[in-house]
Amino acid sequence: MAKYIPKTGSRKNVRIGSRNHTRKIPKGIIHVQASFNNTIVTITDVRGRVISWSSAGTCGFKGTRRGTPFAAQTAAGNAIRTVSDQGMQRAEIMIKGPGLGRDAALRAIRRSGILLNFIRDVTPMPHNGCRSPKKRRV
């Protein structure tokens, strides 16, 4: 029986271009979404393309520990470490949500050495929109 010879230039096996394309990003936007259960930090460039992200869950915190301020601080530090290597110097911060990690994430970003243009709270507030769910009785 004839021996199978795999094609070396097949489209399946060859990656066109690199996956981790490092480009210089002088300015970016840091989005912090702090809920009661988790804190997600996403860093984008000015056009909105995601450069780096991290959350308390990806940093190894499980269960109720994800909502703690220390978990938010760790998540913010992990996200910023990757973009500071790419040369980010200036950033704008958008903070969303009522969680405990808001201030801790902001403190970690401040300590990183990135200059902040402004800090904006973009928490969605209804102007008497949909009816809220009933309160829990425990």
UniProtKB/Swiss-Prot annotation:
It is found in: Plastid, Chloroplast. GO terms for cellular component: chloroplast; ribonucleoprotein complex; ribosome. It holds the Pfam family Ribosomal_S11. One of its GO terms (biological process) is translation. Keywords: Chloroplast, Plastid, Ribonucleoprotein, Ribosomal protein, RNA-binding, rRNA-binding. PROSITE patterns: RIBOSOMAL_S11. It comes from the Eukaryota. Its main location: plastid. One of its GO terms (molecular function) is structural constituent of ribosome. PANTHER family: 40S RIBOSOMAL PROTEIN S14/30S RIBOSOMAL PROTEIN S11. Part of the 30S ribosomal subunit. HAMAP family: Ribosomal_uS11 (MF_01310). Belongs to the universal ribosomal protein uS11 family. This is Small ribosomal subunit protein uS11c.
